[in-house]
Amino acid sequence: MALRRGGCGALGLLLLLLGAACLIPRSAQVRRLARCPATCSCTKESIICVGSSWVPRIVPGDISSLSLVNGTFSEIKDRMFSHLPSLQLLLLNSNSFTIIRDDAFAGLFHLEYLFIEGNKIETISRNAFRGLRDLTHLSLANNHIKALPRDVFSDLDSLIELDLRGNKFECDCKAKWLYLWLKMTNSTVSDVLCIGPPEYQEKKLNDVTSFDYECTTTDFVVHQTLPYQSVSVDTFNSKNDVYVAIAQPSMENCMVLEWDHIEMNFRSYDNITGQSIVGCKAILIDDQVFVVVAQLFGGSHIYKYDESWTKFVKFQDIEVSRISKPNDIELFQIDDETFFVIADSSKAGLSTVYKWNSKGFYSYQSLHEWFRDTDAEFVDIDGKSHLILSSRSQVPIILQWNKSSKKFVPHGDIPNMEDVLAVKSFRMQNTLYLSLTRFIGDSRVMRWNSKQFVEIQALPSRGAMTLQPFSFKDNHYLALGSDYTFSQIYQWDKEKQLFKKFKEIYVQAPRSFTAVSTDRRDFFFASSFKGKTKIFEHIIVDLSL
């Protein structure tokens, strides 16, 4: 009985072992089929698939090479090959995908060769190749790539060779980063041919001279808002510091600001008090700093900076009998002598030139009376000194400096320009221009043609009180202030030789625009008669970003 039970137990165990033995090769065969699909050819170290619609899902092993040819999947998704961490070579040729997503090759820390050739790729995400720090060879040849995202190769620290042939690159601003990268990389890169824009067609990207002009523009952004009204702004440098003097008639102040190199803004430095101050003009003579403070009431005065008091103190009065309604102060030099002129807009006013005599300023010449002058501008015309006076009662007149009498004498006028509020001069490429501001009608831009000033452009300017030219490096602008609508900034178009509209800014009742540069930054003060004074910063915008 026991023997029978023992025999049956041995027989059962034998049958169980035989059954298990029979099952082992079947399981191994199933696993082999799962590891190598019908569309693929597999060895211990490599897989080649033709016409596959998916990436083989194979248990991680020693697979070091994967080739997918004529595949039908439409994109390379993130971490699409992460289940094959031992890959050293990945070939993706003649497939249907059009896009490579971010982190498409994440997890392939040992990948050295990546060939993505002859596909239909149009888009590559910025972080598509992230993590491929051991990659030495990359080919994107013969795809439909028109542009590559900035820094797409930034993770490829070991890259030796890059092939970009056979694509359709648009060599516009989007290619600027690639242009710069090609100049700096130590990798060997195939020629990148441009199919556009037309001026670069069939050229090599490396042969493009520069993208600086096409791919940069400028802008004005609000940097600082000053909580007070103002009518004029002047700037001056003293002992390597930059200062700004702001006339505030409603607050009866001439506020002096200084540039704070730490906080990077303009802060209060000193305050000159007065009555209805309409102008603060700085004059630097040797190491001395003076400020002419023009007032509507109580006479105008000159202040001098006192080092011991570290503030401006009254230095001199300007005769009330000569200047009763100052409207503009203009500083100039002739034969190393310092002058300034005050334009008087009262009916019986005398626009007067003042001269420095080493002890103070004295009235040097009365220009004319009864004309209600609104502005004075010193201009060098063909090497000769001139003053242009604008007036509410006549066209702008031109006075020329007489070297014999050392006085200004009438020389001519600017015809057909009645009711001009202000005249400003500026130069571009050694050519002299004038901007003439009119409150009603069109303001004008004029050019000197060696004989006379001729009009080159009319700017609609209803309610304009100022048309101010200013420049930052090679960028030339006109700021047209308006009491009725947005103020306009115009930029000079070198090709058309005209000013074109560039930007609208909102400033309530603007009265002056002043350019100030410091710490390699450029600013633009906009005074406001009815609102807050604004400081705009002139910035360079890279269109390739």
Curated annotation (Swiss-Prot):
Ranges in coiled-coil conformation: none
EAR repeats: 219-261, 265-307, 311-358, 360-403, 407-450, 452-494, 498-540
Subcellular location: Secreted
SUPFAM superfamilies assigned to the protein according to its UniProt record, in alphabetical order: L domain-like, Putative isomerase YbhE
Biological role: Required for the development of soma-targeting inhibitory GABAergic synapses made by parvalbumin-positive basket cells.
InterPro entries: Cys-rich_flank_reg_C, EAR, EPTP, Leu-rich_rpt, Leu-rich_rpt_typical-subtyp, LGI_related, LRR_dom_sf
Glycan-modified residues: 70, 186, 271, 402
Residue ranges of domain LRRNT in the record: 29-65
Keyword Electron transport among record annotations: no
UniProt protein name: Leucine-rich repeat LGI family member 2
Keywords: Glycoprotein, Leucine-rich repeat, Repeat, Secreted, Signal
Record's keyword annotation contains Signal: yes
Segments annotated as LRR repeats: 86-107, 110-131, 134-155
Tissue: Brain, heart and placenta.
PROSITE patterns cross-referenced by the UniProt entry: EAR (PS50912)
Domain of life, source organism: Eukaryota
Gene behind this protein: LGI2
Leader sequence segment: 1-28
GO cellular component: extracellular region
Sequence ranges assigned to domain LRRCT in this UniProt record: 167-217
One Pfam family linked to the record: EPTP
Biological process terms in GO annotation: inhibitory synapse assembly
